[in-house]
């Protein structure tokens, strides 16, 4: 029985990155032996155990054989006769197929270290094509390591395209797609995830509402980059600069989905795209069972981002209408994420990447001025019933008029 450190821990240590978690492969052991040693079994589909002291995952060395389409159609063989190299062979990328033995020696049968140095994401073997989830994983690793200059190897890109053409991606269940997408949104370069999926054709299959944004023109006066798909990924990149919050990044990604269904005869104008975007956000979230925290912010940004951009030009009563529409008084915790997503949209244009966004500060000030006027104060003044709401509205509008004057409006 021998134990080897495998996968991401070995990769990240060689890259000089913090090791997030340590996974181990055990060769020459049975499940019964692991239990006798005090390990606790947690794997449902194959034998994975938690170490009795460190609680790190230890998996029996295994092989996998494809028996049906999709990512679940596998038969697992995990017996003492499975070698370390056989276990590493079933892994997705060469950079994830390295191990260290108990003495710390590197075991690298598929040249993962060379691919690390060449900054290549390369599949280990043709068996890569048996699991369509690997397409999503490659895209996610590309998003994680983009800042280090990694790219997908040409032969791996070609294999991914063949997998998509063969319909393998169609077998992915929504929850698994969202799981990988959510993780990708948290990576350093989330736009790269969608670029890789687009390159292999998977974006059109999984996220057609994003794919159809590419090639759709916008007015060059406001969008020097012109292409709506290019703009969308620029906005996502800006959102990643502004915040690590994945809900903000998702809202940035989906804020303009309605521009993909703009009638051709009104292009490059996109009149009414906000409501179309809202409808598409709901459909996307329903399809992938995306949590409400993502849906709620994305809908807010899709519907109201134009008001944010025009904040300095709006009448005070219109600013108040927007704040009420955003539910900013009852749900103030969502207001700052909304403003950050709008700032990302403003900056996600060629030549605008580092420009200030004073609209956000203006709306923050407007929100604060309105919050300072409460219904409780009006009740204390003796107002009742409808008069409270009317007075609250009037005083908030007056406060916003004063604010606009202070800002030179």
From Swiss-Prot:
Residues 228-329 form the HD domain. Magnesium is required for nucleotidyltransferase activity. Nickel for phosphatase activity. It catalyses: a tRNA precursor + 2 CTP + ATP = a tRNA with a 3' CCA end + 3 diphosphate; a tRNA with a 3' CCA end + 2 CTP + ATP = a tRNA with a 3' CCACCA end + 3 diphosphate. Mg(2+) binds at residues 21, 23. GO terms for molecular function: ATP binding; CCA tRNA nucleotidyltransferase activity; cyclic-nucleotide phosphodiesterase activity; magnesium ion binding; phosphatase activity; tRNA binding. It comes from the Bacteria. CTP binds at residues 8, 11, 91, 137, 140. Gene3D superfamilies: Beta Polymerase, domain 2, cca-adding enzyme, domain 2. The keyword Oxidoreductase does not apply. ATP binds at residues 8, 11, 91, 137, 140. Its EC number is 2.7.7.72, 3.1.3.-, 3.1.4.-. Keywords: ATP-binding, Hydrolase, Magnesium, Metal-binding, Multifunctional enzyme, Nickel, Nucleotide-binding, Nucleotidyltransferase, RNA repair, RNA-binding, Transferase, tRNA processing. A single active site specifically recognizes both ATP and CTP and is responsible for their addition. Comprises two domains: an N-terminal domain containing the nucleotidyltransferase activity and a C-terminal HD domain associated with both phosphodiesterase and phosphatase activities. Monomer. Can also form homodimers and oligomers. This is Multifunctional CCA protein. It comes from Thioalkalivibrio sulfidiphilus (strain HL-EbGR7).
């Amino acid at each position: 029985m021998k134990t080897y450190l495998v996968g991401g821990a070995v990769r990240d240590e060689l890259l000089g990155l913090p090791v997030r978690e340590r996974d181990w492969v055990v060769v020459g052991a049975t499940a019964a032996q692991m239990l006798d040693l005090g390990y606790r079994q947690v794997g449902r589909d194959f034998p994975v155990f938690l170490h009795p002291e460190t609680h790190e995952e230890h998996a029996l060395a295994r092989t996998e054989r494809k028996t049906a389409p999709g990512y679940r159609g596998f038969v697992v063989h995990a017996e003492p006769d499975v070698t370390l190299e056989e276990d590493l062979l079933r892994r997705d990328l060469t950079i994830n197929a390295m191990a260290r033995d108990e003495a710390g020696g590197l075991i690298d049968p598929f040249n993962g270290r060379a691919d690390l140095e060449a900054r290549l994401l390369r599949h280990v073997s043709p068996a890569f094509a048996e699991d369509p989830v690997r397409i999503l994983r490659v895209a996610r690793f590309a998003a994680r390591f983009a800042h280090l200059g990694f790219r997908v190897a040409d032969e791996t890109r070609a294999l991914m395209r063949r997998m998509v053409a063969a319909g393998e991606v169609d077998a992915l269940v929504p929850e698994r797609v969202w799981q990988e997408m959510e993780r990708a949104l948290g990576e350093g370069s989330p736009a790269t995830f969608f670029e890789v999926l687009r390159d292999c054709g998977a974006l059109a299959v999984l996220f057609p509402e994003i794919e159809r944004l590419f090639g759709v023109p916008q007015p060059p006066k406001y969008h020097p980059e012109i292409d709506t798909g290019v703009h969308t990924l620029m906005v996502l990149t800006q959102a990643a600069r502004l915040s690590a919050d994945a809900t903000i990044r998702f809202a940035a990604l989906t804020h303009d989905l309605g521009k993909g269904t703009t009638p051709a005869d009104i292009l490059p104008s996109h009149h009414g795209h906000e409501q179309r975007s809202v409808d598409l956000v709901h459909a996307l979230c329903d399809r992938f069972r995306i949590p409400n925290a993502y849906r709620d912010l994305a809908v807010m940004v899709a519907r109201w981002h134009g008001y944010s951009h025009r904040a300095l030009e709006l009448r005070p009563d219109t600013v108040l209408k927007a704040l009420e529409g955003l539910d900013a008084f009852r749900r103030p915790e969502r207001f700052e994420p909304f403003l950050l997503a709008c700032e990302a949209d403003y900056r996600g244009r060629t030549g605008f990447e580092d420009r200030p966004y004073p609209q956000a500060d203006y709306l923050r000030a407007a929100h604060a001025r309105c919050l300072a006027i409460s219904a409780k104060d009006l009740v204390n003044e003796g107002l009742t019933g409808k008069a409270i709401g009317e007075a609250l509205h009037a005083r908030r509008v007056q406060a916003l008029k004063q604010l606009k004057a202070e800002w030179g409006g």
